[in-house]
Amino acid sequence: MSRLTWAEAEVSPEVALALLESLRDADIPTEHLKDEDVQQSLPRRLGLSPVVEANIRRYAALSRDGGSLRAQEVGELFQLVSRRPDARSVFWDAGRRLAQQASKRRGGVRAIARGLPAGVRRRMGLRGVSRIARQLAPDGDVRTELRPTGLIMNGGLLAQACRSDAGCLLLNAALERSLELYRAEEGPISHVECEGRGDRNCTWRPATA
């Protein structure tokens, strides 16, 4: 995805909101260090800054009102987070957060899924995460596969914004959590192909596939 496409495309604010909430939670101090190294601690405190809090409120309002964000703004947020030493855990938490929110919107996930065949539960889990993936590929392609279970994305913001596979952990976690919520557990999910590593697509599959 080119810089021009990022500037023109619009995406849902939900991903940006989840990412900033995860960033904020990661930066809440668990203890006070008297001899704190400011240079070391400053990057970790970004999530507690007034700018981040203001953007959380803005993204939440946009989400409630059905608004959108420029894809460029979301891509720049991914770039910012990817430079943190704890980037992988922040992306992972955001992915789980998004899957949880998606399931709540559909209501009663666990109760509905309990009596359904495994294949139907798997399809429901994939449908939930594919919606998240499409928010991250406004000018790309997203598809899912049932046998073996898989999520394939081409031209998404994740790898292209981060220029690595760190941001792709967001969908890694979202897929894993979505399948758990629909009781279609496949175990750990692996990111077997990555555009950020030079592959043609980003592909996620169960580690045992």
Give residue ranges: language-model regions.
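Short, hydrophobic/π-rich interface segment
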Residues: 138-195
